[in-house]
C-alpha cells in the first residue's frame, strides 16, 4: 500500500466496524427481544446459542476491524457470519426494504473481502506488529553484514 492509503484504510475499517459493534451492542442490551425476533424468523432450535454466537461475532469482529488486530481473521469470520444471516433475515425480495438490506449486506461482505485481501493498513495493531517484525529483521540483517561482510561467512 502506498503512503496515501493509511488514513482511508483506517476510516474504512472504522466505518465497517461501526455497524457490527452497534448491532452487537443492541443485541446485548435486548436479549429477549433479539431472541424473539430470531424465533419469528424460523430459528427455533438452540436460539440462545445462536444469540450469544451473534453477539460474540459482531462485537469481537467489530473490535478486530476497529483496532486492526487479527484483522484478516476477523473480516473472514464476519463475512462467513453474514452469508447465512443475510439469507435468513433479508431474503424476502418482494419487500423493497429487505432487498435494500440484502444488497447492503452484500456490499459489506465485499468490503470485508477487501480487508481480507489487502489487510488493515499501517494504522493498525497488525500494521505496527508487521513493521516491528520487519524492522527487527532489517536490524538483524544489518548486524550480520557488519560482522561477516556481504559474503555471510
Regions found by a protein language model. Name each.
Residues 28-45:
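Membrane-interface interhelical connector segments
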Residues 1-29, 46-56, 60, 67-153:
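Extended, low-polarity transmembrane helix blocks
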Amino acid at each position: 500500500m502506498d503512503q496515501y492509503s493509511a488514513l482511508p484504510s483506517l476510516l474504512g475499517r472504522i466505518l465497517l466496524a461501526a455497524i457490527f459493534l452497534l448491532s452487537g451492542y443492541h443485541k446485548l442490551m435486548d436479549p429477549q427481544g433479539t431472541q424473539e425476533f430470531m424465533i419469528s424468523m424460523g430459528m427455533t432450535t438452540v436460539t440462545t446459542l445462536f444469540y450469544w454466537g451473534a453477539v460474540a461475532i459482531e462485537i469481537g469482529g467489530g473490535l478486530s476491524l476497529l483496532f486492526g488486530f487479527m484483522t484478516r481473521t476477523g473480516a473472514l469470520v464476519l463475512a462467513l457470519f453474514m452469508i447465512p444471516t443475510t439469507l435468513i433475515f433479508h431474503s424476502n425480495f418482494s419487500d423493497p426494504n429487505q432487498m435494500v438490506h440484502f444488497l447492503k449486506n452484500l456490499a459489506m461482505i465485499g468490503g470485508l473481502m477487501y480487508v481480507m485481501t489487502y489487510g488493515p493498513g499501517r494504522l493498525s495493531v497488525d500494521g505496527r506488529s508487521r513493521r516491528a517484525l520487519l524492522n527487527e529483521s532489517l536490524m538483524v540483517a544489518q548486524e550480520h553484514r557488519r560482522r561477516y561482510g556481504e559474503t555471510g561467512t
